[in-house]
A protein has these predicted regions:
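NAD(P)-binding Rossmann-fold cofactor-contacting core
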Residues: 5-26
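Membrane-interface segments of envelope glycosyltransferases acting on lipid-linked substrates or membrane lipids
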Residues: 1-6, 78-81
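Small-residue helix-packing motif on alpha-helices
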Residues: 12, 22, 39, 176-181
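Rossmann-like NAD(P)(H) cofactor-binding subdomain of soluble oxidoreductases
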Residues: 19, 25-28, 36-48, 52-112, ...
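Short acidic-hydrophobic, aromatic-tinged amphipathic segments that line or gate anion-handling sites
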Residues: 31-36, 138-139
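Conserved H-loop
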Residues: 8-9, 33, 68, 176
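Internal alpha-helical scaffold of NAD(P)-dependent oxidoreductase catalytic cores
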Residues: 83, 87-93, 109-147, 158-181
């Protein structure tokens, strides 16, 4: 989404322990690394797109890094801005984001919440960044992110269940499997 919106690949660094994923991003001219600390040191914005259960392990070796001049964006479901601040003690600007699955094809919806220390400039950057993969909406109370997470995680499943029921109904009315799709 970012590259399609014209964001320069040379402004992005992707850190991933998986060699195949690094190769995938490298083919688009994106810098890749396995050294989180080095990448973070040279970045203004740090996006944590990891499973919530591994976030603490990712952050632990970074606790001594100075995040005071960086925007932290987290896509780790259920991890509060307070918890992120505990994991990254020097972080001043933290935004939680919960995109839904259609974001993978640029048609998503993302809920955002910013902690009280996040500047308007950082809020705007986070919103612009997420707008590259769909629409955005800000919530004013972090507890509302639970509802956003539930909707983001569940709504695609309900939609596909609805489509399967429609297909089954059409097949019961005489259409074959291909026609009912």
């Amino acid at each position: 989404g970012l590259l399609k919106q014209g964001y320069p690949a040379d402004k992005i660094i992707v850190n991933d322990p998986n060699e195949e994923k690094r190769a995938f991003f490298a083919q688009y001219g994106i810098a890749v690394s396995t050294d989180n600390e080095q990448s973070i040191t040279q970045s203004q914005v740090v996006l944590f797109a990891v499973k919530p259960q591994v976030l603490a392990n990712v952050c632990k070796p970074l606790s001594a890094v100075d995040f005071s001049d960086k925007l932290i964006i987290s896509i780790a479901a259920g991890i509060s801005t307070a918890r992120l601040a505990e994991l990254l003690p020097t972080a001043k600007s933290i935004v939680r984001v919960m995109p839904n699955t259609p974001a993978l094809v640029g048609e998503g919806m993302a809920g955002l919440f910013a902690d009280k220390n996040t500047s308007e400039i950082d809020r705007t950057f986070a919103e612009d960044l997420l707008s590259a993969v769909g629409k955005t909406t800000w919530v004013t109370n972090e507890a509302q992110m639970h509802a956003v997470t539930a909707a983001s995680g569940s709504s695609p499943a309900y939609f596909f269940q609805f489509l399967e029921a429609m297909q089954q109904g059409l097949m019961e009315m005489g259409l074959d499997e291909n026609q009912s799709r």
